[in-house]
A protein has these predicted regions:
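Long, contiguous amphipathic alpha-helices that act as assembly "spine/axial" helices in icosahedral shell
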Residues: 47, 72-134, 163-178, 212
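Residues that form generic nucleotide/phosphate-binding pockets
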Residues: 15, 19, 112, 158-161, ...
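N-terminal "assembly arms/tails" that initiate or stabilize quaternary assembly
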Residues: 1-75
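Extended, solvent-exposed, turn-rich assembly/linker loops in the middle of proteins
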Residues: 131-204
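Internal mixed-charge
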Residues: 176-178, 185, 192-247
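A broadly conserved detector of short glycine/acidic/proline-rich loop/turn motifs that flank catalytic sites
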Residues: 51, 83, 180, 216-218
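A generic structural signal for short, non-catalytic loop/turn and secondary-structure boundary residues
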Residues: 38-41, 70-72, 80-82, 167-169, ...
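Short helix/loop capping segments that flank catalytic or ligand/cofactor-binding pockets
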Residues: 55-58, 97, 183-186
């Protein structure tokens, strides 16, 4: 036999394998929320919740008119603070790595913050449970073995609730979770024909008066009670993702 000596050669390309992230356009629904960036240095922002309207009298013959106070209310909103844990980058890494380690770390911090802020935002918008002015509507479609699928009848029920509350037709936003998007794609030809993600603002389509978006970071609800899981709670088999609508 023959004995040969050789040198194993390796090369570092600088190419990076990154984790999948939510595409920026998939967060287009966040751009539809009015920003109050000028107040973010405060712990709490106070809004005024306008009370009822005055009574309107038609062909009134009784004088003097009744005096009715219109009472407004303070609506405080506490702000969340988001931080990322520090990540060390050594001099050896800066000089030895075949890629820009500092830029990579900064990008991961920005992406992680963006993901968490979006998830917290949609969780905060979603109602805790069904109540007057904040309806929670259960889906009524066929069972897939774990939950009832979403149908156009459920979307119409949501529209009826918004109509009853007097929500203006313009700027009604519906953020569908991927489960509900797939339900509608599977059963509703009209939705399938209109399903087309706008690469600029992330909107899928406009149907039944809603600008519809798709986002998979929506909160979970307990199916039997219709109550939202607390932020950070681990969902069980009896829980399901929800879609969230707002104005």
């Amino acid at each position: 036999g023959a004995l040969r000596a050789g040198v194993l050669r390796e090369i570092w390309t600088g190419e990076m394998i990154k984790a999948f992230r939510t595409a920026p356009e998939a967060l287009g629904w966040m751009d539809r929320i009015r920003a109050y960036n000028q107040y973010v240095e405060n712990d709490v922002i106070h809004f005024t919740e306008i009370g009822g309207d005055p009574a309107v009298l038609v062909n009134n013959t009784t004088y003097p008119l009744n005096i009715t106070a219109l009472t407004d209310a303070d609506k405080p909103i506490s702000l969340d603070k988001f931080d990322t844990e520090a990540t060390p980058v050594t001099d050896d890494e800066l000089h030895a790595c075949s890629y820009d380690k500092m830029a990579s770390v900064q990008e991961r911090h920005r992406d992680a913050l963006r993901e968490k802020i979006a998830q917290k935002a949609i969780h905060g918008i979603a109602p805790d449970e069904n109540a007057t002015g904040i309806p929670v509507i259960k889906t009524t479609g066929a069972s897939d073995g774990t939950r009832l699928k979403m149908t156009f009848a459920d979307l119409l029920a949501l529209k009826r609730e918004f109509d009853k509350m007097g929500v203006p037709m313009q700027d009604r936003i519906l953020v569908l979770c991927s489960d509900h998007v797939n339900d509608l794609l599977e059963t509703e030809q009209k939705f399938k024909e209109h399903y087309n993600i706008n690469q600029t603002d992330g909107k899928i389509c406009r149907m039944y008066g809603f600008d519809i978006y798709e986002y998979d970071g929506t909160p979970y609800y307990t199916m039997s009670t219709g109550k939202k899981l607390a932020w950070g709670a681990v969902p069980a088999s009896t829980d399901a993702k929800a879609s969230v609508a707002f104005y």
